[in-house]
Amino acid sequence: LFDLFWNPQQQLKKIPLKEGMKVVDYGCGPGRYTLPVAKMVGLKGKVFAVDIQPLAIKAVEEKAARQGLTNVETILVDSYNTDIQDSSIDLVLLIDTLPIIKDYDALFHEIHRLLKPDGLLFVKHGRIKMSRTTEIVENTGLFTIIECRGHDMLVAPKTR
């Protein structure tokens, strides 16, 4: 039912994805966005699927293997730290994850650490109001909001 309203293929058209990009799908769940993104970035790109749920990570691994996707790396976290190299990521996806986050400061500091200076953060926040999402992002002091449209927000890291 979720895909009926928020079809991943349609949603991904809104995001500036290119072949060769390194992408983090933070709060990847069962890989609804991870797998299509992996196809879009191609073999020269990479997608890090990050989640706190072992079953979600296992589901992504199994689906990626079935689809022959070798550019997906799963990361099971118990906090917000991913251990991905600093300033190495072109794009972070944060899709319908904000409602379950307990420590916004830790999450956004980690995302800021991961992003290249010209990297982007895409936030989709279907279960909270845009005004609340804007408040959360602005309160970090780490990002500049580039665009807000419907439930979507595109954000750039402020310089370090």
Go through the PLM ranges and name each one.
Residues 118-126:
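Conserved beta-strand signature within the Rossmann-like core of class I S-adenosyl-L-methionine
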Residues 80-92:
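A short acidic, Gly/Pro-enriched loop at the edge of an enzyme's catalytic core
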Residues 53:
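Conserved SAM/SAH-binding beta-strand->alpha-helix loop
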Residues 68-79:
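Conserved SAM-binding strand-loop segment of SAM-dependent methyltransferases
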Residues 20-29:
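Conserved class I S-adenosyl-L-methionine
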Residues 90-103:
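A short SAM/SAH-binding and catalytic strip from SAM-dependent methyltransferases
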Residues 2-21:
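Conserved alpha-helix/loop element of class I SAM-dependent methyltransferases that forms part
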Residues 105-117:
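A short glycine-rich, Lys/Arg-flanked "PGG" loop and its adjoining helix->strand segment in the class I
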